[in-house]
C-alpha cells in the first residue's frame, strides 16, 4: 500500500510463556481471522435481512478473503429478483468491496460447495446469467485490480428460472413473448457433457486438468516470470506479462477448438503451484480463483458468449499492461509448521467445518 495509511509503531510485544496462539497472521487460508469473520457475519445477518428482505442466507467464504466472493441464497418471487438482490447488496456498507456475487435458490445452503458447483453447471447460461459491472468500487487491499480502489464486478445468477420469467418453459402472459432459452437451463432436459478431458491433458501448455462438473473444467499451467510467493514483485516486467497473456490466450483457444467445445461452458485457468487432486484441493482452488483474478483483466467470452474463460493466473507487474505491484503470500517455515503441529494442546481440537464437500475433498 502506497497511500496515506495510519502507521503503528510497536514498542513491545508480550505473551504468555506457553501461549497456545502466539501470533495472529493473515495468509493462505484457513486462518484464525476467517472464523472471527464468519462469527461477525452471522451476527450482522439479521440486520442485513432487515434491510434486504429477499436475502435468505449469505456466506462469505474465508477461502476467498471475504471481500472477493459472496454466495447469496435469495428469494425468487418474480423474474430476475435475485439480480436485484445482488445489486442491492453491493450497496450495503462494506459489501460494496465485493468482487463477485453468486446468487442461488433460497432453499440451497450457500456453504455447500457441491450444491454451488451443481448450480453453476445446471443453472447458469453464460450469455444471460453472467453480468459484468464496469468501473465499480474496489477494496484497497485487492492487489489484482489494475487501479487502486476501482475494479469491475461480477454477478452470477445461478437460481432456478421462476414460472413467470420469459425464459421459462411456460406460456408467456398475453401480449408478451418468450425468450429463447436452452432446455437444460429451463430445467427440463440435461445438457451435453464435455468429453475431451484427456485431449486437454495433452495440450503442451497444460500441466494438469480436472473436471469439477460435466461442463466445468479447471486447468493449471506454468507461467514463466511469475512473482515469487515468498517475495512478491515490485519490478515491472512487460515482456513476461505479455508472454503470460499470450500463453493464456493460446491455451484458451486450444481448448475451445476441441470437438466437444460447445459443452464446456466454464474454463478456469490458474498456476500450477497447486495439485488439483490433493486433499482439500478445492479449498485452495477457491482461494486462487478469486484472489488472483480481476474481472476486467481475466474474464473472456467466446464470440457467441456461450462459453467463459476465467484467468486466475498470477499477473506479473507491468506498466504497459496495467498490473500493479504484486504482494508476497504470508508463508511459514517448515520449522514453524512442525513446531505448531507438535503442540500438545492442538491434539484436542480440530478446525470447525466451514465448507461442506459432501464427504469429498
Name what the model sees in each region.
Residues 1-361:
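Charged, compositionally biased interaction regions
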Amino acid at each position: 500500500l502506497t497511500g496515506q495509511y495510519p502507521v503503528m509503531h510497536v514498542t513491545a510485544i508480550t505473551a504468555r510463556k506457553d501461549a497456545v496462539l502466539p501470533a495472529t497472521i493473515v495468509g493462505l487460508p484457513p486462518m484464525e481471522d476467517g472464523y472471527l469473520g464468519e462469527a461477525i457475519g452471522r451476527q450482522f445477518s439479521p440486520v442485513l435481512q432487515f434491510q434486504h428482505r429477499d436475502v435468505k442466507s449469505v456466506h462469505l467464504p474465508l477461502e476467498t478473503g471475504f471481500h472477493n466472493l459472496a454466495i447469496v441464497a435469495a428469494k425468487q418471487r418474480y423474474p430476475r429478483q435475485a439480480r436485484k438482490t445482488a445489486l442491492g447488496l453491493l450497496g450495503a456498507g462494506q459489501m460494496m468491496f465485493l468482487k463477485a456475487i453468486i446468487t442461488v435458490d433460497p432453499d440451497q445452503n450457500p456453504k455447500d460447495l457441491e450444491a454451488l458447483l451443481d448450480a453453476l453447471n445446471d443453472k447458469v447460461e453464460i450469455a444471460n446469467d453472467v453480468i459484468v459491472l464496469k468501473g465499480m468500487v474496489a477494496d484497497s487491499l485487492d492487489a489484482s485490480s489494475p487501479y487502486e480502489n476501482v475494479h469491475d464486478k461480477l454477478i452470477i445468477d445461478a437460481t432456478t428460472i421462476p414460472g413467470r420469467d420469459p425464459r421459462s418453459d411456460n406460456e408467456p402472459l398475453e401480449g408478451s413473448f418468450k425468450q429463447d432459452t436452452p432446455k437444460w437451463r429451463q430445467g427440463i432436459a440435461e445438457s451435453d457433457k464435455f468429453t475431451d478431458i484427456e485431449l486437454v491433458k495433452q495440450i503442451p501448455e497444460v500441466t494438469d486438468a480436472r473436471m469439477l462438473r460435466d461442463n466445468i473444467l479447471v486447468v493449471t499451467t506454468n507461467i514463466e516470470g511469475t512473482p515469487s510467493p515468498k517475495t512478491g514483485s515490485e519490478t515491472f516486467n512487460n515482456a513476461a506479462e505479455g508472454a503470460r497473456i499470450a500463453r493464456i490466450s493460446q491455451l484458451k483457444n486450444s481448448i475451445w477448438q476441441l470437438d466437444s467445445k460447445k459443452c464446456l461452458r466454464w474454463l478456469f485457468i490458474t498456476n500450477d503451484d497447486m495439485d488439483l487432486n490433493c486433499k482439500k484441493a478445492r479449498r485452495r482452488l477457491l482461494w486462487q480463483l478469486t484472489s488472483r483474478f480481476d474481472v476486467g483483466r481475466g474474464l473472456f467470452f467466446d464470440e457467441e458468449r456461450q462459453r467463459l474463460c476465467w484467468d486466475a493466473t498470477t499477473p506479473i507487474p507491468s506498466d504497459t499492461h496495467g498490473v500493479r505491484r504484486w504482494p508476497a503470500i504470508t508463508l511459514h517455515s517448515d520449522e514453524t509448521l512442525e513446531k505448531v503441529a507438535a503442540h500438545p494442546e492442538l491434539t484436542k481440537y480440530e478446525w470447525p467445518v466451514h465448507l461442506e464437500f459432501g464427504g469429498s475433498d
